[in-house]
């Protein structure tokens, strides 16, 4: 999960390595954080006019707004992580077993 990008909707992506948290914007403290970030020029609105459903907190102090639910974003992250695990290079031992059996490991 350290590299790559996360699709946050409408062909917009964010670097996975910069994400600190993904939260719902419904609570008063998060709404206050969003307002302050906007005042300070640290808000990125990627909702394309849709309802804000997730606020993504980043390392640099920026907040990125998304129209995609936090649960959906997290499941996309988990899918990406699982795919990375499946595409990891196989070990030498696994390659030998694959050659012997003629099947994929």
UniProtKB/Swiss-Prot annotation:
Q: Which ranges are annotated Acidic residues under compositional bias?
A: 78-105
Write down a Pfam family by its short name. RemA-like
Instruction: Name the InterPro entries on file.
Output: RemA-like (IPR007169)
Q: Where are the transmembrane segments?
A: none
Region spans: Disordered: 76-105
Which family would the database say this protein is a member of? Belongs to the RemA family.
Against NCBIfam families, the record matches this protein to: PRK04323.1
Q: In its UniProt entry, what is this protein called?
A: Putative regulatory protein COPRO5265_1186
Species whose genome carries this gene: Coprothermobacter proteolyticus (strain ATCC 35245 / DSM 5265 / OCM 4 / BT)
């Amino acid at each position: 999960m350290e590299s790559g990008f996360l699709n946050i909707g409408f062909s917009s992506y964010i670097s996975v390595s910069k994400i600190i948290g993904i939260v719902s914007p419904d609570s008063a403290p998060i709404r206050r954080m969003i307002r302050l970030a906007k005042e300070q020029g640290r808000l990125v609105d990627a909702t394309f006019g849709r309802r804000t459903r997730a606020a993504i907190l980043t390392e640099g102090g920026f907040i990125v707004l998304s129209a995609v639910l936090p649960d959906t974003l997290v499941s996309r992250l988990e899918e990406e992580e699982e795919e990375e695990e499946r595409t990891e290079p196989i070990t030498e031992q696994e390659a030998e077993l694959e050659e012997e059996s003629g099947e994929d490991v």
